[in-house]
Amino acid sequence: MFSRLSVPGPFAAAASDGRRRQNIHNNYFLALDKRLSIVRHLLNPCCMKPLFRVTILSSWASLLTAAGEDGKLAIYSGTYENGVFQSLTFVNPVMGWDAFFNSGFRGASTVIGNIEAGNIWFGHEAFVRAPGATTGFSTYVNPAAGSLNELDYHATTVGHVLAGSGYIPGDNGGSFSNFGLGMAPEASLVSAGVAVDFSATDLGSFSTTDDSVILPYRAFFQGTGLAPGLARPDVINSSWGGGDSSATWVKSLAIDALARQNPSVAHVASAGNGGTATVVSPAAGFNSIAVGSLGGASFLQPSSFSSSGLADFYNPAESGGTNHAGVRVAVDLAAPGEQLALAAYKGDSGSIGASSTLGFLIANPVPTNQYFLNMDGTSYAAPFVAGGIALLKDVANSVWTAESKPEAYDTRVIKSVLMAGAEKTLGWNNGQNAFNVTTQALDVKTGAGAMNLLTAADVYFSGNQDIAEGAARQMSGAGWDSATIPLGGAFDYVFETAFAQETALNVALNWFSVREFDNLTNTGSDIAFSNLNLEVWMLDGNGAFASKIGESMTTYNNTEFLRFDAVEAGRYGFRVTYDSKIFDLSNAVTQESYALAWNTVAIPEPSALFLLLGSGVLMWKRRRV
């Protein structure tokens, strides 16, 4: 799925100003100021912070490409040591991105929103669009009192991952740069900043107010106050966070409530860089998709810095309000987040402008062709997922419309599809015991696993799509369903045909925490929390549920997930139950809407696989689950 190579050739001779440069395909110069090493991990308790680690090394370097590549590649990850690159990896294809790009699905029909401390600087060459492009970039001016609305280097690196264009003007229609392409290079991208102050001493830390956070999220979720003609975003990325692991602060409640009331707008948030520390908000929210970071040779190794601590659950109806500490997994998915080369903004604003020690980085005019190296953090894992969602919705727009099939665009469906299509990461463990029962559902660092867009697309488009109601809903080998279940109810799903051989199986169930947003007060409120469970059964010869082979039964999470590396041949089914409510302040919640998605992969017998390998041609391709 990805290439790995050693960088050929020496660096070019140093320029007179001390910088080393290399001509890329005779049309592209890259340079990087690398003088100071700074590694930041978790958040300062007093401040919000973008969730990243940055390394700025102590020399100048040029980024090199591999000889013979066609240029239609992606963001790089690589190890840079002692003045040379040890290796480079093209990151986007690891997640199945290239199939979308080569098929012409590059996000052109979608809008991505990015909300964090500062704004994206769209003056970098990574954001140059081809002549005649009908999509582009815009900045939302935060109207909250004290909002700085400043350009920031961190937002610019995140924007590169989301929708870097990579277009280089030139003869014959130009070309795409190796370093420029983001996940959705033709999507519209709108940026908003929430900071009212940047720290002078702690790089990346910033302060906010309730209004400075809530107003841009309200605008993006509801599609108000954006650039003329710009539709509300299909997905919002949040690469920042701080505190509130119970997701009950004013900001967190508002974001979660807006996500529930506007389900066609997916919200993706970075999990944090605290290692074993608790996942913080907005990623700790219930109605978002929280993303952890991956590294390693195949990007299946959980990053050591990626936050994995269990989040809290606050029950407002219990004893006047009770906080249950460390009772739920907050991470939903994982994506690459290590050693990335990303667009550099070196202007006198945002985090760098406020810093008391990094003034030497500031350049005027701001160079348009420089890249930060060795960028780590869940801040970058999240936009890989957000950009991936834009690609899925771009394809969806060629199949359905939001009006004709609104459930297909629902965040609960998108989240379940991505989980069902996720690949097992190294050391993945969701607490399934010998009887395949789990009260945890997800792995603490990577959730359901590594995002795999190819498998997700198979689940989303190729299988069942919103199954008709019946006594038992009939399923093919992959697909999704959305339904509304009454309190105390149980809905059954059965595979149309039996598995003829051992089969790998993923199944994901998601629903929303009931939180409501008040447009008059700009606040969110906690209303109710439903407790659904997910069971997997083997059927008997008459098609009846005979023996339960697994169950995901969390108490304080709104996700259930099961992974079977192999179930024996036979016919199977799922059962979704709505057993109880953890609380209901309204005393009016009698049903809950959910999304279910699943994926199966037949496992060939060793003898059959041996014959294929022995012939010298591997004809079988196992879908990654």
Regions found by a protein language model. Give the residues of each.
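Bacterial N-terminal signal peptides
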Residues: 54-63
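Exoplasmic/lumenal beta-rich domain surfaces
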Residues: 342, 349-356, 530-569
